[in-house]
Each structure stands twice: as structure tokens, then as C-alpha cells.
Amino acid sequence: MKPFFLFAPGAGAPSSHPWMQGWKKRLVEIGDVVTFDYDYMLQGRRRPDRLPQLIATHKKALAAARAKTSGPIFLIGKSMGGRIGCHVSLEETVNGLICLGYPLSAMGDRTKLRDQVLRDLATPILFVQGSRDPLCPLDLLGKVRAQMNAPNFLHTIEGGDHSLHVRKKDLGAETQEDVDLRVFAAIKDFVARFSE
């Protein structure tokens, strides 16, 4: 049975953003993909809703997704969308979580970590992180991962930022497409492992 991806956007850009659409196009090669937007985005506001409302919107989108598939469901999200997916998985059963740039440290502050939800998880999770992401220093993520109960995996993008983008000078002979294809392969492997 084909996997189903519920793809949540980050805080700053809606699901129509080219970055989201580009990844949606890739994910369609593995399974069915549905994107959605949080209420504040639909209302044209910049500031995200409070956590309970973000979770409620995400759960509503998940309920709609369940009506469309009986296959394995994966919550995938860019930054905030991945974090909210983690919260949703504490209340709803899904096959796995895929976080594209998890925002571990609030506003890049190493003392304010959004790690409790990760410690509470039972759902398998794949982190896709850039090594230059100020919102998720890899040393801090490593410490959190060591204390997590859920099966957790990390795909690191050397030189990648919060949007998984690698600067030209760091790419060498590679292209961003090469980097993205490796991310896609990691996602594909994770999904295959947890699709039963």
C-alpha cells in the first residue's frame, strides 16, 4: 500500500511556497502527498497561532488525510510544521515523523530548547538537518537524541542551513540537486522501514 504524506509548512511561508512545492513534487514519487496551511496563514497574519491551535489545525488535516487513505501515514514538516507534527503524534498514531530542519532552539537560543516533545515521542522520527542551521545545533540535537525513547535517525547536510540549502562555495563539484537527492534517498529508506 502506498504511503501517505501529510506535509506541513514552516512558520514563515505557506504550502504554496516554491520550496514546499519542490519537495511535494519529489515525495509524490514515493506516495500520495497533501499539504495544508495553518489558520494564521490562511488569515494573512504573520504571527503563528498558539501551540494548541496549531496542533488542532494539524489534527484536523490529519483526520481529512485518514479519510483518503488506509495506507501508512507519515507526518512531514518544514521547521515548525515538523515540530507540530511531533506534538500531534503524541495524541494520534502515525507510522513516522520526518522533520526537515527541526527548530530545536527557540530563535537560536541554546538555552531555550524545544526538546520535551522529542523526549515524549514513541513514533519513529527522521531528522534532516543542515550543519549550519542556527536553530538546531547538531551537538545539542545529539544530546537530545541520546535521551529519546523513540527510534530516531539523522541525515546531516554538510554546510546546509535551516532550509537545507548549501552555499555554492560549500558545494564543491556538487549541486543543490545532488544534496536534495541524498535527502530524498534518506526519506525513502526511512519510509520503507516504517511502512508496515
Regions found by a protein language model. Name each.
Residues 11, 131-133, 159-161:
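Acidic beta-to-alpha connecting loop that harbors the catalytic carboxylate
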